[in-house]
Amino acid sequence: MSHAIGAIIAGTGSYVPEKRLTNDDLASMVDTNDEWIVQRTGIRERRIAGPGESTATLAAAAARKALAAADLRPQDLDLIICGTATPEMDFPATACFVAADLGLNSTPAFDVSAACSGFIYTLETGANFIRAGQYENVMVIGAETLSRITDYKDRSSCILFGDGAGAIVMQRHADPKRGLIYSTLHADGNGAEVMKCIPGSRNPISREMVDNRQQFMQIKGREVYKFAVHKFEELIQQAMRACELTPETVKLIVPHQVNQRIIDSAMEKLGLPPEKAFVNIDRYGNTSAASIPIALDEAWRQGKLSEGDAVVFVAFGGGLTWASAVVRI
């Protein structure tokens, strides 16, 4: 679909907590070891929110960095959207807390919930407000404190997740061939049982739930792996085809940081050199909706991106959801 207005990335920012949880740390908590974790996931450590830190505080810190990169003030923002599966609370929206932290008292703010696909869902939502001519500057955030819903007695899942936030400022641009030029969003609620965190209106939290440790994330690892392997390759192929990109003209693949083996396998099958995938899962683990914007910010600050470069985003997560996007820097 063609658009008359472009929605470009004017600035990026990210923030991760200082506390590191290494594989050796986890080995002292559950029956695992560094070699086992690295071989199966590529993860060596992850960041964990400390006292006084939350999804909103991480998000606000990333947002401030994105504003600085875009040379804007908080007052220049027309809208704030936060993609998260670990909101500050059921309500108000995490984005409202971020707006208040930035000193704003009338800027619209809301959350998007699509688990690990949440950032691409949020990106598309923000871009469409700009394309409609309604807003000029939109803050798009992916932020998570997954440590708060991780069961550190479950060795199959506690090794995977970390906390962090990434943010971008999307801005109106006269050239519709710049910025977000392609995206596709999908969901299949029939797969809801594959990845879930059950406390809610269907299952109000109770003593029995806590006694059975059911307040934490529940993941069917093998099913997730099969789903991710299939969708990763499919989504990138579709995005490249839609934008007439080749392995030579794609500058960078910025995937959801789910598993090093999945990323490596897909890149090989697609005929893409491994160095074209930006990967930081070894340092942060899986940060769900935050993983893509954190990786994008790091790639940008490392000088890996220049104006005109084509960047592909790809993600999949609970819902089940899956999504991809192409941005022309």
Regions picked out by a protein language model, each given a short descriptive name:
Residues 9-11, 37, 66, 77-80, ...:
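Buried hydrophobic positions in well-ordered alpha/beta secondary-structure cores of metabolic enzymes
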Residues 38-57, 85-138, 268-296:
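Conserved catalytic cysteine-centered active-site region
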Residues 62-78, 234-251, 299-304:
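Phosphate/pyrophosphate-binding loops at sites that engage ATP/ADP/AMP, CoA/4′-phosphopantetheine
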Residues 1-51, 154-226, 230, 234, ...:
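Condensing-enzyme catalytic core mediating Claisen C-C bond formation in acyl metabolism
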Residues 15, 83-88, 114-119, 142-147, ...:
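Acidic, glycine-rich active-site loops and adjacent beta-strand->loop/helix elements
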Residues 228-233, 247, 251-270:
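Active-site pocket-lining segment
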